[in-house]
């Protein structure tokens, strides 16, 4: 098997569409004020199904995870450390774990946290001027009738966002605009909560 970006991402997180859908259903069933160590990760599998391979493209300290494969010195250094961290895992996971520990980790906003905040404050329309990997969007999507407008400049994410919105029949209330949000005239939008997390 060749090491394509898609293959690499699946070797680290091989999430089926069914697993992703189940994760979204669990998020939709999460009650207000019920987040704990057992369920605060709910929703991340769903997002990783769509966005994980793109998260691996993000450069931290000058290197994306994919860049490591092109840099023999860095690869050897990280794989050596990865083998010590997780000697029984496959080499790609060893490399990924070492990358996250020694280079950096590209995290997502927890959809469960976003959902809980929305349930607590009861907004009708969210404005998010830095949508990123979709955590706040998915929190909004999980609540019927809640509107969300997000902005992001990473056009590579458009196809995945479109799939999420279309497959959940939420195009009437969930919107993502791929543009620099500083160019938007927010006075033309209707929203009663601004909730964002810039990079």
Give residue ranges: language-model regions.
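Class I S-adenosyl-L-methionine-dependent methyltransferase catalytic core
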Residues: 1-41, 52-68, 73-199
């Amino acid at each position: 098997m060749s090491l394509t970006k898609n293959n690499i991402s699946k070797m680290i997180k091989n999430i089926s569409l069914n697993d992703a859908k189940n994760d979204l259903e669990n998020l939709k069933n999460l009650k207000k004020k019920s987040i704990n160590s057992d369920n605060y990760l709910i929703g991340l599998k769903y997002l990783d199904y769509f966005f994980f391979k793109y998260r691996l493209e993000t450069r931290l300290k000058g290197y994306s995870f994919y860049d490591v494969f092109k840099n023999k010195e860095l690869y050897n250094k990280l794989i050596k450390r990865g083998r010590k961290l997780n000697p029984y895992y496959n080499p790609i996971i060893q490399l990924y774990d070492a990358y996250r520990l020694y280079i950096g980790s590209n995290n997502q906003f927890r959809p469960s946290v976003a959902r809980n905040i929305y349930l607590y404050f009861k907004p009708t329309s969210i404005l998010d001027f830095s949508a990123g990997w979709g955590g706040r969007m998915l929190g909004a999507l999980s609540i019927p009738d809640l509107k969300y407008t997000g902005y992001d400049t990473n056009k590579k994410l458009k196809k995945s966002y479109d799939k999420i919105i279309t497959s959940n029949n939420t195009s009437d209330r969930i919107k993502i605009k791929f543009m620099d949000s500083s160019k938007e005239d927010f006075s033309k939008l209707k929203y009663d909560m601004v909730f964002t997390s810039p990079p």
